[in-house]
Swiss-Prot record:
Protein's name in the database: Bifunctional lycopene cyclase/phytoene synthase
Transmembrane segments: 2-22, 36-56, 70-90, 120-140, 143-163, 174-194, 217-237
Sorted UniProt keywords: Carotenoid biosynthesis, Isomerase, Membrane, Multifunctional enzyme, Transferase, Transmembrane, Transmembrane helix
Ranges where the record places region Phytoene synthase: 246-614
Membrane topology: Multi-pass membrane protein
Region (Lycopene beta-cyclase): 1-239
Source organism (scientific name): Mucor circinelloides f. lusitanicus (Mucor racemosus var. lusitanicus)
SUPFAM superfamilies the record matches: Terpenoid synthases
Length: 614
């Protein structure tokens, strides 16, 4: 059956591109837009000239009645193909690469000689190949088409290997998958089109060898090499953006650089970062970040996994925030350390916050770390150093509010009434929700007004209450047995019930009573949720899916608790498969729950327990 070139796009390439675009939509960021614009511009301009050259020399031909128009020597649909292929491969590569932080594949500690060899050997081989191919590309000869492909692709591959070769070698599976699947798909489209007579490859300028019927080896080589160029280009941009994100210092008054710089300025900065070898980068920065993420990974595997649905730069900063919260929480919760020592460490943390917000830069070198090194654990110091990079985003008030929550627990103060419950929950949960929201809003494509920012933050703080109330409702027995604590308002309880719960005997107040208390708290959370979940729609679109997923998964615990009628579970739990289902549907805004949830809050164990059970 004869296919027109436009039908090839309508039936094959565009539907797949549409699916990839839909899958990528929740994660689409300004960095992705930059990738698409830059790589498409380069691919289109270079491929247009190259393709006109080979068509002029009759290496590739098309059915004259199968195209809508010809520009130069090349059909309009072929120009479309350059753009579609670039968008398709880059979109797929983004989906494959996004699940790990790009900065983890930059290694300043790598020996210089190793880096020189890893760069020099492939670059030399690629340039020699390009040189020989240039001289073999004689029009009308069997090696013409294949040689043209090699001299076109190999110099670009050499350049990209110079800037990102080691980075890509550290994630080989992701790179290979990103190259292989688009290549196989486009080869299949090529087989269909050649078989249908849409276009053809001249036997006079090719070897006449086929990988499979209707797939000349030159066509396979073209798709494999050009997809390799596109994947290498995507990885190179990922690496440069990771470097810029870590090493471009920001003042409290400076927005993220990609929002305030022109396209040309961004390209110039990226060129600078592209040329930097790993060894000139500050290794302590990567060490501190790695330690912070180890804290996150060990403390909450669930949140570590769930954070993958956020864009890389947002995910990195949320992870740093979590590590700081966890590290400071551990300072106050470590029962092996005397209470007085923990109180002194809390005072020290207050001093760190004052020092941090008393400076005019986010650079960790502005802090006198020798003062803290002698009094805090090494892991805590690393978390603090990474946290300094959030100086330009956060405000001191929310951090100090969180520290007030730690003080409440250190003093083992009781929650006497509803007002105490709200105050404590605001300290340990709303404060974190506010900080998460400020991080997310800092990565918005367009800055929100002051009034709108305050409204969104208020919704996030309310969501903090929702999640903390759910947390307390779920852990009445656990808090009693493990901590000897009662986080329920004491004016909800009799003196005997308070004594039983604080004595580790919460079960003895009865199953129905436990259910009644937990449901009462959940229903309060439900009422707050009605207003709190409105904030999500005002967040940057590329973060809404992640926030929605995290909150919906946690709110499902409240739904689970309400399903119990006769027995209060020690720890209500939503199964892994159900959590995955809720998270995936939430990312694409397809999840419908009894109570819709959204916002940007995570809480700590006993204080931060929410994050540990997502």
């Amino acid at each position: 059956m004869l296919l027109t070139y436009m039908e090839v796009h309508l039936y094959y390439t565009l539907p797949v591109l549409g699916v990839l675009s839909w899958l990528s939509r929740p994660y689409y960021t300004a960095t992705d837009a930059l990738k698409f614009k830059f790589l498409t511009l380069v691919a289109f301009t270079t491929a247009s000239a190259w393709d006109n050259y080979i068509v002029y020399h009759k290496a590739w031909s098309y059915c004259p009645t199968c195209v809508t128009a010809v520009i130069g020597y090349v059909p309009l649909e072929e120009y479309m193909f350059f753009i579609i292929m670039t968008l398709l491969t880059v979109a797929f590569t983004n989906l494959v690469m996004r699940w790990h932080l790009h900065s983890f594949f930059i290694r300043p500690e790598t020996p210089v000689m190793q880096s020189v060899l890893v760069r020099l050997v492939p670059i030399t081989a690629l340039l020699i190949t390009a040189y020989k191919a240039w001289h073999l590309a004689v029009p009308g000869k069997p090696l013409f088409y294949g040689s043209c492909i090699l001299w076109y692709a190999c110099p670009v591959l050499a350049l990209l290997w110079f800037g990102a070769g080691e980075y890509m070698m550290r994630r080989p599976l992701a790179v290979l998958v990103s190259i292989a699947l688009p290549t196989l798909f486009l080869c299949w489209v090529d087989v269909v089109a050649i078989g249908a007579g849409t276009w053809d490859i001249s036997l006079a300028t090719s070897t006449g060898k086929f990988v499979v019927p209707h797939l000349p080896v030159e066509e396979f080589m073209f798709f494999a090499l050009i997809n390799t160029v596109l994947v290498f280009g995507t990885c190179a941009i990922d690496r440069t953006m990771a470097i810029l994100h870590l090493f471009k210092n920001k003042s409290p008054y400076q927005r993220p650089y990609q929002h305030s710089k022109s396209f040309l300025h961004q390209i110039l900065e990226m060129t600078w970062a592209f040329c930097l070898p790993d060894q000139v980068l500050h290794s302590d920065t990567f060490h501190d970040l790695s330690v912070s993420w180890d804290i996150l990974r060990k403390a909450s595997k669930s949140f570590y996994t769930a954070s993958a649905v956020f864009p890389g730069d947002v995910r990195q900063e949320l992870g740093v925030l979590y590590a700081f919260c966890r590290a400071t929480d551990d300072l106050c919760d470590n029962e092996q350390v005397p209470v007085q020592t923990r109180k002194e460490q809390l005072i020290l943390t207050h001093q760190f916050v004052s020092d941090l917000f008393g400076q005019k830069t986010s650079a960790p070198t502005a802090i006198d770390w020798d003062f803290y090194n002698d009094q805090l654990p090494a892991s805590c110091i690393s978390a603090f150093k990474s946290f300094t990079r959030l100086r330009h985003v956060l405000e001191a008030g929310a951090i100090k509010e969180l520290l007030d929550g730690y003080k409440w627990d250190l003093e083992r103060r009781s929650i006497r009434d509803q007002e105490d419950l709200r105050y404590y929950s605001a300290c340990v949960a709303s404060s974190v929700g506010e900080m998460c929201t400020r991080i997310i809003l800092a990565h918005a494509d367009k800055p929100a007004s002051r009034q709108q920012t305050q409204w969104i933050i208020q919704r996030a703080r309310e969501m903090g209450l929702v999640l903390q109330y759910t947390n307390i409702a779920r852990d009445i027995v656990t808090d009693s047995e493990e901590l000897g604590r009662c986080y329920l308002p004491q004016d909800w309880l009799t003196e005997k019930e308070v004594a039983l719960i604080q004595g580790g005997l919460a079960r003895e107040i009865g199953e129905e009573r436990l259910l009644s208390l937990s449901h009462r708290l959940i229903y309060q959370a439900d009422e707050l949720m009605v207003v709190a979940n409105k904030g999500i729609d005002k967040l940057p679109s590329h973060c809404q899916g992640g926030v929605r997923a995290a909150c919906n998964v946690y709110a499902s615990i409240g739904t689970k608790l309400k399903s119990y009628k006769h027995h209060y579970p020690s720890r209500a739990h939503v199964g892994n498969s159900k959590r995955v289902e809720i998270a995936l549907l939430s990312v694409y805004n397809l999840y419908t729950a009894p109570i819709a949830t959204s916002s940007t809050t995570h809480c700590r164990q006993g204080k931060m327990r929410n994050l540990n059970t997502i």
